[in-house]
Amino acid sequence: MNFTIPAPFTAIHTIFDVAFTTGLDSMLETIQEAVSAPLIACVTLWIIVQGILVIRGEVDTRSGITRVITVTIVVALIVGQANYQDYVVSIFEKTVPIFVQQFSVTGLPLQTVPAQLDTIFAVTQAVFQKIASEIGPMNDQDILAFQGAQWVLYGTLWSAFGVYDAVGILTKVLLAIGPLILVGYIFDRTRDIAAKWIGQLITYGLLLLLLNLVATIVILTEATALTLMLGVITFAGTTAAKIIGLYELDMFFLTGDALIVALPAIAGNIGGSYWSGATQSASSLYRRFAQVERG
């Protein structure tokens, strides 16, 4: 049996990965080139003004030096393509995935998820086509039931794949706009935007960890049980019994799919709680200082 695309999940993952990697890398270079000259000019002027204020005693020396160092580091990350690649992009695209892989329960690399889904898709399609050949062209009830079972299975596979593929793509998108967001870290009014950007990257890192723990177990379990379940379905007595068996297979996949689809919300709650807690702590600290000053 020949499919139009023998490995659809791997093919789609590769196509989108190459497209986004190429396009976003080009956009990142464009952004860095656009903000480099004006940012360096503004920061140079700001450092001169900051030095004058420190000399005149209008700004605390320690505070002024700390601000200058912070701004210098941020600017170096923004305008230096090598610095941004080494200290920001490589952390979230290389270091974090390698670190996450160490916590694998099944030993199944997370990168093989598309290939595993391709195998499941190919095996199930062989059985689906065999059962479809047994249904008469005038048996509308069985045809409708069969198509429903087929679409449910497609939906479970594609939704699980979508969660997996979206993590990598959206991480690339956030990293591509990183230089623009980091500019906001220099200013007090826009510093929260940069903090939320970092928080979102941490959320995707947590999601990658959860996928490595949960998705690999779910997919490996489904692949292991699939052969047995399809064998039982194939040798069922009647076509109607086989279609019922397909729905039972759908229920099995839906259970695993629910676990995978829930992971983004869990990662978002953990990451959001962390940053909400950090903001609350900073506000509480500010109120305490205000009370001390009034006292």
From Swiss-Prot:
Keywords, ordered alphabetically: Crown gall tumor, Membrane, Plasmid, Transmembrane, Transmembrane helix
Main location: membrane
Gene Ontology CC annotation, any one: membrane
Keyword Plastid on entry: no
Transmembrane segments: 35-55, 68-88, 167-187, 201-221, 226-246, 251-271
Record-linked Pfam families: TrbL
Location in the cell: Membrane
InterPro entries: Conjugal_tfr_TrbL/VirB6
Its membrane topology: Multi-pass membrane protein
Protein's GO biological process: protein secretion by the type IV secretion system
Family: Belongs to the TrbL/VirB6 family.
Function statement: VirB proteins are suggested to act at the bacterial surface and there play an important role in directing T-DNA transfer to plant cells.
Protein name: Protein VirB6
Species whose genome carries this gene: Agrobacterium tumefaciens (strain 15955)
